[in-house]
């Protein structure tokens, strides 16, 4: 089970990625520093679960990499958005 901080960050990331967004802009939008530790803790697991997709999946660190929510991510967002 996700702890509250991670769950809150997951929700925020899913909301912010409804359109393609660069990592720096994504982390700024959710008040996190654009640091590799935050990528590893919050973004990479969502990619691995298939909830977020990468514009350049063959290169995780592509200089123009952008992220967007996937259909399974949208379904999860709908589930966790309900009161």
What are these regions (language model features)?
Residues 1-83:
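C-terminal regulatory or interaction extensions
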């Amino acid at each position: 089970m996700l702890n509250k901080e991670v769950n809150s960050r997951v929700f925020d990331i899913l909301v912010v990625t409804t359109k393609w967004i660069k990592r720096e802009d994504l982390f700024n939008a959710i008040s996190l520093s654009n640091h590799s530790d935050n990528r590893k803790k919050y973004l990479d697991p969502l990619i691995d679960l298939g909830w977020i997709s990468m514009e350049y999946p063959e290169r995780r660190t592509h200089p123009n990499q952008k992220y967007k929510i996937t259909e399974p991510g949208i379904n999860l967002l709908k589930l966790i958005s309900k009161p």
